[in-house]
A protein has these predicted regions:
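Glycine/Thr-rich phosphate-binding loops of Rossmann-like dinucleotide-binding domains
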Residues: 71, 94, 142-144, 219-220, ...
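C-terminal cap of metal-dependent C-N hydrolases
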Residues: 149, 203-256
Length: 263
């Protein structure tokens, strides 16, 4: 399909363009990642998927929407009335182009982190119902795998452990309501994927629960990171929200930074 060719071709052509531009340099700067994995390529890919699903009358869930323009492809109708739904990742709700300067390849992911206008549009789309799900896109690469330039560094970052507190921090800033966070991270995923007896606190449902507290600020550092990769792009960030306990199927599996058992 021409749309696929345009999307993939755009990435390849831009990749080759920057290889040539920086052939006498140590590597391609990470700041060029969003130019290689461009907004145009994202839109072409999503547009094709939505068009094909619409023509076929098929059910479609689009992952990792990262640009303002892509949001035009989706509806703000109630979830139960949609045949085409959309998801945004926490990284794209937190970071923007300027953050490459400080965090470098730590925030390299696919799709790439885009401009602040894209991030702000995604946040608004969460609130208006255009974005149906918030996901982690958890990819716990080792720091050694994140080394290199815009092409060599692995894409993805560990996001599960601090995903909820990150979103609750945005709620504290007035960006989302707590109810919206619960809807996008619990209710909607269960409904969209048809996961029975989960996603809600209801009698007869599996008790998958998280107990959080709100108090003094604490800081993410290597001592409280539980992921085996041993790092987080959120190191140095502080939060007032804290996960105290996690239950899966009614069993306590996490208690104050202690991983107890598998569910």
């Amino acid at each position: 399909d021409r749309s696929v060719s345009r999307g993939l071709g755009d990435v390849y052509k831009r990749q080759e363009y920057y290889k040539e531009m920086f052939r006498n340099a140590p590597g391609i700067p990470i700041s060029k990642h969003l130019n290689i994995r461009s907004a145009a390529a994202c839109y072409s890919s999503s547009q094709l998927a939505v068009r094909m699903a619409s023509l076929a009358g098929a059910r479609l869930h689009v992952l990792h929407v990262s640009t303002a323009k892509e949001l035009q492809l989706f509806s703000d109708a109630p979830l139960e009335d949609k045949h085409i739904t959309a998801e945004a990742c926490i990284a794209h709700l937190l970071y923007r182009q300027q953050d490459y300067k400080e965090l470098g390849t730590r925030i390299k992911c696919n799709p790439s982190i885009k401009k602040q206008a894209d991030r702000d549009a995604l946040r608004n789309a969460v609130n208006t119902g255009v974005i149906d799900v918030i996901a982690t896109d958890h990819a716990p690469h080792l720091l050694s795998e994140k080394e290199g330039d815009a092409l060599k560094a692995m894409s993805g970052m560990p996001m599960i452990q601090f995903s909820l507190v990150s979103m609750l921090e945005l709620a504290e800033k007035g960006i989302f309501s707590i109810e919206t966070i619960v809807e996008k991270m619990c209710h909607a995923p269960a409904q969209i994927y048809g996961i029975c007896n989960r996603g809600y606190i209801r009698e007869g449902y599996q008790a998958d629960l998280v107990l959080v507290s709100h108090g003094e600020r604490w800081e993410v550092n290597t001592e409280n990171i539980l992921s085996k990769c041993g790092w987080s792009p959120l190191e140095g960030n502080s939060f007032r929200w804290k996960v105290e306990k996690t239950f899966a199927n009614g069993h306590l599996i996490y208690l104050s930074l202690i991983h107890i058992s598998e569910p």
